[in-house]
């Protein structure tokens, strides 16, 4: 009993702190044995406890771990107390799935179903794929393989097999750990050590190969604007005051610069609404572009053109876009890019946040929301975008744009590599969960795309992590972000980002190979149990 408590308690500590933003050491150790210790502890209880008790123990273990991992969601200052209900539903779903999988693992060890154990890493990938692709807009945060992102070599392993490959190898390694603790055979030790080393060896080998061939010859000169507004602060300001602050920040930019990047929904009113008067903004306008003629009323596009004219560069800015469809107003979360030649390209966010940007469940979901959470009953419908976000920044450099947590989905960003984008651009706003871990959690999930696809990235955020990262996941420049101990300050990050890119297996095949493995594994484990059941029935007949 003591060993069971020790194994389960130690596994809880390791997995809880196995977050790249919290502890690199715990993340590495967790990938090796964190879950294996849990399964060994549960296996020790099989003789003295019912399967129901074992499942409940695994459920509460997972519930508490996931509750800690998603604790940033409980910052309710802006999103309201209803977020507790959403948080509880999410971690309960995750706990049910992992507790059930853990019982399957324990059963296979207990009954010595070695053939079934072979399929289990793929089975887990299939389980995670359901929430990654099918749970509302998808839940990409905190997949089992995420602790590998704590090291450069672990992240680089994703360039072969993506998030699914990372989860696969972590489950396989921990199954090896459990077999070591159960059998203590030399073969088990060898298999476990091979699994431990495999992702770091493969990822590290390719990382060092790319690093030796890395080139800084071609760069993109970027100015990333971090306004430093929380959602509440921005809502209390007039649109003219917001622009006055943005222009003031931009005055510190030193030419030459190729592109100025602003965060998600930096200004209100969309691109073409004449919401500004020359008289009210004359002083700011003349400081930005002297001797320029302005109409009495002008738009956000006019502001952006003035910035582009002043700094002779492209400008990318997040804002909302309204569209009237059959008499009904629809809203898009958009990114607007103005090239140096004056061409405007729009990109609409394709993966929307449930609750914040749309109400799941159609009319039925809206009715429930209006009855129980009226403050979240949206008066308009926000639509997902339908087209790719490739924009031309300079004559030679194209960017692939994502908004908010779209960057955490490899399948959503993968087409940009195939469409010959040179750099990734993410516009986001983590200010809805102030003073929480979210900025770093979001950043570490997003930076995986750099090494998965072999592409650099620039991120513009209001209060989160505004940074430039090269194609090997190395931070070229970063601004301070908001945390519990550090308030955020308005600033501009001006940096030259190498646009060196390289081919990856994931960029060529995406998630398809591991999804094939996942489906095959589910069929394999079902076939295994059906075959054993058939043998059992045949034996009983004899």
UniProtKB/Swiss-Prot annotation:
GO function terms (MF aspect): N-acyltransferase activity
Source organism (scientific name): Chlamydia muridarum (strain MoPn / Nigg)
Annotated membrane topology: Multi-pass membrane protein
GO biological process, one term: lipoprotein biosynthetic process
Regions that span the bilayer: 26-46, 54-74, 89-109, 113-133, 163-183, 187-207, 509-529
Active site: 264 (proton acceptor), 349, 404 (nucleophile)
Listed name of the protein: Apolipoprotein N-acyltransferase
Listed CDD domains: ALP_N-acyl_transferase (cd07571)
Pfam families to which the protein is assigned, alphabetical: CN_hydrolase, LNT_N
Pathway given in the UniProt record: Protein modification; lipoprotein biosynthesis (N-acyl transfer)
Gene: lnt
Entry GO CC: plasma membrane
């Amino acid at each position: 009993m003591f060993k069971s408590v020790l194994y389960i308690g130690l596994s809880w500590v390791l997995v809880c702190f196995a977050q790249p933003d919290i502890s690199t050491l715990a993340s590495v150790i967790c990938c090796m044995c964190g879950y294996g210790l849990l399964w060994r502890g549960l296996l020790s209880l099989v003789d003295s406890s019912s399967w129901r008790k074992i499942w409940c123990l695994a459920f509460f273990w997972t519930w508490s771990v996931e509750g800690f991992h998603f604790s940033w969601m409980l910052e309710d200052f802006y999103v309201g107390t209803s977020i507790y209900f959403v948080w509880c539903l999410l971690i309960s779903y995750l706990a049910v799935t992992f507790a059930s999988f853990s019982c399957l693992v324990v059963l296979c060890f207990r009954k010595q179903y070695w053939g079934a154990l072979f399929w289990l890493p793929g089975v887990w990938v299939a389980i995670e794929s359901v929430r990654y692709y099918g749970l509302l807009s998808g839940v990409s945060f905190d997949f089992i393989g995420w602790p590998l992102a704590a090291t450069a070599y672990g992240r680089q392993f994703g360039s072969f097999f993506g998030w699914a490959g990372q989860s696969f190898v972590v489950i396989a390694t921990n199954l090896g750990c459990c077999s070591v603790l159960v059998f203590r055979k030399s073969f088990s030790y060898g298999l476990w050590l091979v699994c431990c080393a495999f992702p770091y060896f493969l990822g590290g080998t390719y990382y060092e190969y790319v690093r030796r061939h890395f080139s800084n010859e071609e760069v993109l000169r970027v100015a990333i604007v971090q306004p430093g507004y929380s959602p509440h602060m921005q809502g209390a300001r007039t649109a003219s005051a917001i622009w006055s602050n943005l222009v003031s920040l931009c005055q510190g930019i030193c030419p030459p610069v190729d592109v100025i990047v602003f965060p998600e929904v930096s200004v209100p009113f969309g691109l073409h609404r004449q919401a500004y008067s020359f008289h009210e903004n004359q002083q700011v306008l003349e400081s930005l572009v002297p001797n320029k003629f302005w109409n009495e009323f002008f738009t956000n596009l006019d502001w952006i053109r003035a910035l582009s004219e002043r700094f002779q560069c492209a400008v990318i800015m997040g804002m909302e876009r309204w569209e009237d469809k059959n008499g009904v107003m629809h809203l898009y979360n958009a990114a607007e890019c103005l090239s140096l030649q004056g061409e405007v390209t729009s990109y609409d966010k394709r993966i929307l946040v449930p609750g914040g940007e749309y109400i799941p469940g159609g009319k039925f979901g809206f009715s429930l929301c209006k009855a129980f959470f009226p403050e979240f009953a949206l008066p308009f419908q926000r639509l997902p975008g339908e087209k790719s976000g490739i924009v031309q920044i300079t004559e030679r450099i194209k960017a692939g744009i994502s908004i908010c947590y779209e960057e955490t989905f490899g399948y959503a960003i993968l087409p940009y590599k195939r469409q010959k984008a040179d750099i990734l651009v993410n516009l986001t706003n983590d200010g809805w969960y102030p003073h929480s871990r979210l900025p770093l959690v979001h950043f570490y999930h997003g930076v995986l795309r750099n090494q998965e696809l072999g592409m650099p990235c620039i991120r513009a955020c209001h209060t989160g992590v505004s940074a430039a990262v090269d194609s090997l996941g190395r931070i070229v420049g970063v601004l301070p972000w908001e945390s519990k101990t550090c308030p955020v300050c308005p600033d501009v990050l001006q940096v030259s980002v190498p646009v060196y890119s390289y081919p990856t297996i994931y960029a060529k095949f995406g998630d398809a190979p591991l999804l094939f493995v996942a489906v095959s594994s589910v069929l394999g484990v079902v076939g295994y149990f059906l075959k054993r059941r058939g043998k059992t029935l045949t034996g009983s007949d004899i």
